[in-house]
């Protein structure tokens, strides 16, 4: 992996690696809570993914084809900005919270992607056995701690009426939004990633980053 590339074909690869549809990510910081959250899918969409410092989440390609995943290779180097691959179970969710972005613009009532680990998925599935399909829930979610010490509290109520998304909001096509890039595209991503982070946090269950977007 070098720090530059040459030629038109490599330029196209690099451009493809830095383009794509931005997707909004649902997350809570320790001590935060969210009310009125709704899971919009019947089941989780299951992947493995790496977090790249400053870039967001990228689906791991190890074992998908004949090529090795460059993110897996880089994640094993000291002080890498690439996190090791994590099991992720992904949902479309409705987040009614209001927030102000870095540009000073206010947003609320948005569809976002929620990535959960297996521990939280088991909690959700247990509640599904009790309350029925996910889309019929209205949730209050709170979180304490981070990494392996994360504790979630999820209260579920059954919805009393059919839910309709606000105008302009729609579900993400998760197969499209989470589709893996090619090895060449991932290498192009790495070529533009500063080595400023550590991969010491190996938690593949509840690790989250304070970032509200992801580039697939």
Q: Where on the chain are the PLM-derived regions?
A:
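Flexible glycine-rich surface loops and low-complexity tracts that mediate binding to linear polymers
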Residues: 134-148
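OB-fold ssDNA-binding interfaces and closely related basic DNA-contact patches used
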Residues: 1-130, 173-216
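Glycine-rich loops and low-complexity Gly/Arg-rich segments
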Residues: 63-65, 139, 165
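Hydrophobic beta-strand residues in large extracellular and virion-surface proteins
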Residues: 91-93, 139-141, 154
